Design a protein with these regions (language model features):
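N-terminal beta-loop-helix "entrance" segment that forms/cooperates
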Residues: 1-11, 69, 120-127
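Glycine-rich, highly charged phosphate/nucleotide-binding loops
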Residues: 4-24, 134-148
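Glycine/small-residue-rich loop that forms an oxyanion/phosphate-binding "nest" at active or ligand-binding sites
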Residues: 19-77
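Structural motif
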Residues: 27-28, 86, 159-160
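A short helix->loop->beta-strand "cap" motif at the edges of active sites that frequently abuts
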Residues: 49-56, 108, 180-184
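Conserved mixed alpha/beta catalytic, RNA-binding, or beta-rich assembly cores of soluble enzyme
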Residues: 61, 86-143, 151-154, 164-165
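Active-site glycine-rich loop that binds ribose-phosphate moieties when present
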Residues: 66-82, 91-97, 143-146
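C-terminal functional extensions of proteins
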Residues: 156, 160, 164-168, 185-225
C-alpha cells in the first residue's frame, strides 16, 4: 500500500468519512476496528448503506472467560467482592473515572495502566489516579511481551485486573498473565455486533468472502476458517 492511499486519524464527521470513501473510489469496506469503537462502526454501516457499498465486519476472537467475571458495564464493579483487593484497571481511558469510582465503592485500592497519550493521562487525572497509582505504557511493550505488566502486578501486589473483552493482544496478554500469576480477571463485555452486517471470524473467511463478492457469488461467512 502506498502512503498516499493511507488515511491516519479519526474522521471528524460521518460526512467526511462518506466524502473520503467516494473520493478514493472504494468498492468494498472491511470494518476491522476495535470492538468497542461503536461510533465508527455505526457510521461505516450508515455510509455503506447510502453508497450501496458491501460491508464486512472482521470480528476478533473471544478468549475463554468465566461468565461470572464478565461485566456489562464498568459501574458493575461497585457490586463485586473487592473489599481490600488491589485492583489494576486496564480499560479505555474514557472509562477510567467511572471504573475507578465503582471500584472504590466496592472497597478496592485502585491502580491503572494507560497508554502514553495526553488524553489518556488527562483522563487518569480526572479519575484521581496519578503518581504511584499510575503506569503509562503500551500493552506488550518491553523486551518480553507481558514482562512489564507482570512486574507491575508484583510491585503493586495486584489481586484483580479489569480489562476489556476486546479479543486483541491486550485481552490475550491479561488472560495469560492472570492464569500464570493466579490473578482474578474481570472483563468488560464487548458490545453486541451491529445487526445486518456480515461478519467473518478469521483471515481465511475474510479472503473467501471477498473472493465471493468479487466473483458475484454469495459465500456464507459463518462456516469454515
Amino acid at each position: 500500500m502506498l502512503l498516499n492511499e493511507l488515511h491516519v486519524g479519526a474522521f471528524p464527521s460521518q460526512g467526511s468519512l462518506s466524502d473520503y470513501l467516494a473520493a478514493v473510489g472504494v468498492t468494498q469496506v472491511v470494518d476491522a476496528t476495535h470492538p468497542f469503537a461503536l461510533t465508527i462502526s455505526a457510521e461505516l454501516r450508515s455510509v455503506c448503506s447510502l453508497q450501496n457499498l458491501p460491508l464486512i465486519r472482521f470480528e476478533r476472537p473471544d478468549h475463554a472467560v468465566d461468565e461470572g467475571s464478565l461485566l456489562a458495564r464498568v459501574e458493575d464493579l461497585a457490586g463485586c467482592a473487592l473489599s481490600g483487593h488491589r485492583l489494576l484497571l486496564a480499560v479505555g481511558a474514557r472509562q477510567l473515572a467511572a471504573a475507578a469510582a465503582a471500584a472504590r465503592l466496592a472497597g478496592a485500592r485502585v491502580h491503572a495502566r494507560v497508554l502514553p497519550t495526553a488524553e489518556a493521562i488527562r483522563h487518569a487525572g480526572l479519575a484521581g489516579l496519578s503518581g504511584e497509582q499510575l503506569a503509562v505504557l503500551r500493552p506488550g511493550s518491553g523486551e518480553r511481551s507481558g514482562g512489564l505488566e507482570a512486574a507491575l502486578c508484583r510491585r503493586w501486589e495486584i489481586t484483580d485486573v479489569v480489562c476489556r473483552q476486546s479479543g486483541g493482544a491486550a485481552d490475550q496478554l491479561w488472560s495469560e498473565l492472570s492464569r500464570k500469576h493466579c490473578i482474578c480477571l474481570w472483563k468488560l463485555k464487548r458490545p453486541e455486533p451491529l445487526l445486518s452486517v456480515d461478519a467473518v471470524h478469521s483471515v481465511n473467511q475474510l479472503c473467501r468472502k471477498l473472493d465471493g463478492d468479487v466473483n458475484g457469488s454469495a459465500t456464507d461467512p459463518h462456516h469454515g476458517g
